[in-house]
Amino acid sequence: MPWLQLRINVTPEQAPAVESAALAAGAQAVTLEDNADQPIFEPALGETPLWSDTRITALFEADISTDETWQKVQNHYGEELPHHHWHVLEDKDWEREWIKNYHPIQCGPHFWICPSWLSPPDPNAINLLLDPGLAFGTGTHPTTFMCLEWLAQQDVKNLELIDYGCGSGILGIAGLLMGANSAVGVDIDPQALLATQENAVRNGLAKEAFPVFMPQRAPKEPVDMVLANILAGPLVELAPALIALVKSGGKICLSGVLGTQRTSIISAYEHAIEFTEVREKDEWICLAGIKK
């Protein structure tokens, strides 16, 4: 069935209360978006990320009365809101739409990320199979692509790896398929840990070949290589822990970082890491280095 979208432009101060009002009025989901092509950087811990001009989009079932629902939103908010728009959102099988547009991605001369329902373009290459129903990282985002591209250029045979913030497990699985001796996945999201292990099995790996942990239970023993594709804020906060996980002479690859955030990352790591490479794609960067 189709859905109705209610779009309201608000200030950052109004956004939390308007979001609550929309949910109280029966919205099935509410999202906050930049309404001015303005990039958003990570807020301080405990803060809500908001732009100076924020669009709230609330999703309602199609059989509601738009006039009555809008009145409910305003009543819950407690005062009159600015101009709003209603839009009809045609129902689609969104996973099918995503599948239609997801194609194999080449991340190195002999390394591909392939949808699990398609035949690999190069059967003789290393082909990592992913399923969109479980994918927290698919290789399509610049940060994931740059990490994979870097990893494909490393000799990882017999190395021990940690994929910190593993998501779909794409980086750790790639390392294992390239010959790493072992990999460990770490993530704060239990669903990501499940996705990682199911994707490992999909690629012919036993679950025990890629054990996964919440951060507080993760092994602390240093390894040969740490891969962390998260965000700049957490990377800075986790710098002491991530540095401690790398053996002396081992390698670290960091991404999820905007070009404008390069200095903060380097400042947090340069006392212990000699950065040897910075990759750039769109507005994102990937930094790799060696532990001193």
From Swiss-Prot:
It is found in: Cytoplasm. Keywords: Cytoplasm, Methyltransferase, S-adenosyl-L-methionine, Transferase. It comes from the Bacteria. InterPro entries: Ribosomal_L11_MeTrfase_PrmA (IPR050078), Ribosomal_PrmA_MeTrfase (IPR004498), SAM-dependent_MTases_sf (IPR029063). One of its GO terms (molecular function) is protein-lysine N-methyltransferase activity. S-adenosyl-L-methionine binds at T144, G165, D187, N229. Its main location: cytoplasm. Its EC number is 2.1.1.-. One of its GO terms (cellular component) is cytosol. CDD domains: AdoMet_MTases. It catalyses: L-lysyl-[protein] + 3 S-adenosyl-L-methionine = N(6),N(6),N(6)-trimethyl-L-lysyl-[protein] + 3 S-adenosyl-L-homocysteine + 3 H(+). One of its GO terms (biological process) is methylation. Methylates ribosomal protein L11. PANTHER family: ELECTRON TRANSFER FLAVOPROTEIN BETA SUBUNIT LYSINE METHYLTRANSFERASE. Belongs to the methyltransferase superfamily. PrmA family. This is Ribosomal protein L11 methyltransferase. It comes from Saccharophagus degradans (strain 2-40 / ATCC 43961 / DSM 17024).
